[in-house]
């Protein structure tokens, strides 16, 4: 079970948002590469970066901070990045800089042809991030709710050749209210590619619950506010996950 620390980037700083609201952000570090090094030193095997400004702007906005992280830890751990990635040139530029996985969200929903092209050109490096509320997909930094069903869309993207799906329950993200285990398992059971859980991780009980259903196809979990607020000790959680599943 991969426990994947999240580093959300806003104006070059590491922050956390509450339910995706840019006006409700808490700054945890003005030097994101220092935070990245911290999680790697504590045993992280993968990092999850989000260019928050980029997600809203539709193009990269925190590339300098991202490149500093890749330069410092990119040779030690896999790094995945989402937010504002809407064209093949951006994907190629980030992969050349040492990124392992590119996360495509809104662009995958709005422009499936782009996702197909990305999977063809960069097979093995494309993850789709599906953000949902009550089973329906949200786009544009969660500001727009669509009528797309998350399971139906995930199955379509699986056929395109994406590496995995990150499933975020946006009603829980940043709220420390607990992972939506049932919805995550339901999605994983419908697919043959792995699912990474996200949104609402609140403590060790969530880690143990996810480990119990890992064999349903759940590869890991994004660790956000809980590891920054102290509600979850990352090192202890990784150790517990290793004990349960390895």
Swiss-Prot record:
The reply to whether Cytoplasm figures as a keyword in the UniProt entry is yes
Subcellular location(s): the record lists: Cytoplasm
**A GO CC term assigned to this protein in UniProt:** cytoplasm
The source's superkingdom equals Bacteria
Keywords from the named record: Amino-acid biosynthesis, Cytoplasm, Histidine biosynthesis, Isomerase
Enzyme Commission number(s) of this protein: 5.3.1.16
Q: Which GO terms describe its molecular function?
A: 1-(5-phosphoribosyl)-5-[(5-phosphoribosylamino)methylideneamino]imidazole-4-carboxamide isomerase activity
Indicate the residues that form the catalytic site.
8 (proton acceptor), 131 (proton donor)
**Pathways per UniProt:** Amino-acid biosynthesis; L-histidine biosynthesis; L-histidine from 5-phospho-alpha-D-ribose 1-diphosphate: step 4/9
InterPro entries, sorted: Aldolase_TIM, His_biosynth, HisA_bact_arch, Isoase_HisA-like, Isoase_HisA-like_bact, RibuloseP-bd_barrel
- Which reaction(s) are listed as its catalytic activity? 1-(5-phospho-beta-D-ribosyl)-5-[(5-phospho-beta-D-ribosylamino)methylideneamino]imidazole-4-carboxamide = 5-[(5-phospho-1-deoxy-D-ribulos-1-ylimino)methylamino]-1-(5-phospho-beta-D-ribosyl)imidazole-4-carboxamide
Name the record gives this protein = 1-(5-phosphoribosyl)-5-[(5-phosphoribosylamino)methylideneamino] imidazole-4-carboxamide isomerase
Name its GO BP terms in alphabetical order.
L-histidine biosynthetic process; L-tryptophan biosynthetic process
Q: Which family does it belong to?
A: Belongs to the HisA/HisF family.
SUPFAM superfamilies referenced in this protein's UniProt entry, alphabetically:
Ribulose-phoshate binding barrel
Pfam families xref list? His_biosynth (PF00977)
